[in-house]
Amino acid sequence: MDRKHNGKAILLEEFCSMKLTDFIVEDAIITELKATDKESVIKEMVCALKDVQKINSKDVENVIKSLMKREELGSTGIGKGVAVPHTKHDCAKKIIGTIARSTQGVDFNALDGESVHLFFLLLSPNDSAGLHLAALERISTVIRDNDFRRFMREANGKAGMIEILKEVDGIHV
């Protein structure tokens, strides 16, 4: 079954069964953030995507500004130690994202006032509102699980985090 969205046909099955591993860039995962404040976290995560050639150097500052502008609308620190900074930007050719972890936690102005330890950054093309929302919904679904959050915080390095992502996506490792 096809569904029209912004003039593009999207397979309904693809729309509804999005996996984290469909858009998380494994090589850009940060197992221990150096950043200690909101803007620095966003910058470090965007630079991780740049470092693996998912964002052009010339777009980095504009992407950071776009993410910070989104934060001004309301914090993406959703609580329980998780934040999901996200935006749409014309530099993105497809939905991409990364994950970062902070052992010490970062004040991200989260809704529950707690420090954030897990960050899921999402960057989507401007014309992909439906898929952007589907990716946010997928992230939202998995981060509701206390075990998932704990396992991601305790995972042994990048390989451990990737293994957990694949497991939650139903990919046998």
Where would I find each of the regions flagged by the language model?
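Cytosolic covalent-transfer regions centered on His/Cys nucleophiles
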Residues: 2-173
